Amino acid sequence: MLKLDHIVISSESLDDGQAFIEDRLGIKAETGGEHRLFGTHNKLISLGTSYLEVISISPDLIAERTPRWFNLDNFTGHPRITNWVCSADFSSFVPHDLMPEIGDILDLSRGSLRWNLTVPKNGILPFEGFAPALIDWGVSKHPSKTLKENGR
């Protein structure tokens, strides 16, 4: 069974993404971290059991793998929702059986977090980015459990 894990807002810079969130929602995003494999960094906002991720290419990192995830190499313009990610238990099904274009399952980590994520070789999710990426957090604590609640 698939379940919404998080929503992705892409931005040309993390500062622009932060300003976008503060202007629209009146909430300051928490620092997430860096993804060295893709040369990106992010900030996060709690949505209860899921979260909002603001992501951009980091000017301080060199990507080890390109094209980058979420089609960030081709992203231009104002920050906006570009993708969504669904959680799944990869031990119970093979993502490629669901949708062959979903991409490779990459074993990723940042600090104490470990996860598996589907990433197409071209960085663009199926159906021109409309299909979700799939994520399996395994035994890692879901990021939403460590974020401040932003209820209003």
Feature locations, PLM:
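Glycine/small-residue-rich interface belts in oligomeric ring/scaffold proteins
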Residues: 13-72
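Amphipathic, alpha-helical segments enriched in basic
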Residues: 4, 20-22, 29, 76, ...
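Acidic-enriched, low-complexity/disordered segments with a strong bias for Aspartate over Glutamate
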Residues: 5, 15-16, 23, 60, ...
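Vicinal oxygen chelate
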Residues: 3-13, 33, 41-44, 48, 51-53, 66-98, ...
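Weak global preference for isoleucine
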Residues: 7-9, 21, 27, 45, ...
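Short helix/turn-capping signatures at newly exposed starts of structured segments
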Residues: 1-3, 53
